[in-house]
Amino acid sequence: MDVTIQHPWFKRALGPFYPSRLFDQFFGEGLFEYDLLPFLSSTISPYYRQSLFRTVLDSGISEVRSDRDKFVIFLDVKHFSPEDLTVKVLEDFVEIHGKHNERQDDHGYISREFHRRYRLPSNVDQSALSCSLSADGMLTFSGPKVQSGLDAGHSERAIPVSREEKPSSAPSS
């Protein structure tokens, strides 16, 4: 049986499971040395690996929770103000859109835009949906669930984003 053994110099740390930050949503915030030379860590030592969760924890990934009583979405939108955000409910989906025009930051000028779309459970009471933005930039979208025999009231409507002065109580995974 022939087994091909590849030298660690030619391996990319975790391959497609560890994407480069170079062109992700943090474009313009500066780079880690790993972003410029991803093969360097395995060249120096085949046993050294960057933390898998370093980029995951700082990537703005949303968290969706659906328990027996309510449905909640947490989304890191620290670069956007409430005026830059639009939250709409279209039938069984919530659409979150953020856009700010070009502005100056520490690294030059930047403009950002994103679209997120989530399916709402069929038993979420759409007349009682709320959305708030915490002081640390965490958007919280929530709605109570109704008992399965009741109509949840599906329609199209905009949800206003209110600003909170305290940091979010969302877990920082």
Curated annotation (Swiss-Prot):
Gene Ontology MF: a single term: structural constituent of eye lens
Residues annotated to bind Zn(2+) 3: 154
Assigned protein family: Belongs to the small heat shock protein (HSP20) family.
Phosphoserine found at: 45, 122
SUBUNIT field: Heteromer composed of three CRYAA and one CRYAB subunits. Inter-subunit bridging via zinc ions enhances stability, which is crucial as there is no protein turn over in the lens. Can also form homodimers and homotetramers (dimers of dimers) which serve as the building blocks of homooligomers. Within homooligomers, the zinc-binding motif is created from residues of 3 different molecules. His-100 and Glu-102 from one molecule are ligands of the zinc ion, and His-107 and His-154 residues from additional molecules complete the site with tetrahedral coordination geometry.
UniProt modified residues of type N6-acetyllysine: 70, 99
Residues annotated for Zn(2+) 2 binding in this entry: 107
Pfam family, one: Crystallin
One cellular component term from this protein's GO annotations in UniProt: nucleus
N-acetylmethionine: residues bearing it: 1
Basic and acidic residues biased stretches: 153-167
Modification Deamidated asparagine occurs at: 101, 123
Protein known as: Alpha-crystallin A chain
Protein role: Contributes to the transparency and refractive index of the lens. Acts as a chaperone, preventing aggregation of various proteins under a wide range of stress conditions. Required for the correct formation of lens intermediate filaments as part of a complex composed of BFSP1, BFSP2 and CRYAA.
Annotated GO biological process: lens development in camera-type eye; negative regulation of apoptotic process; protein refolding; response to heat
Binding site for Zn(2+) 1: 100, 102
CDD domains attached to this UniProt entry: ACD_alphaA-crystallin_HspB4
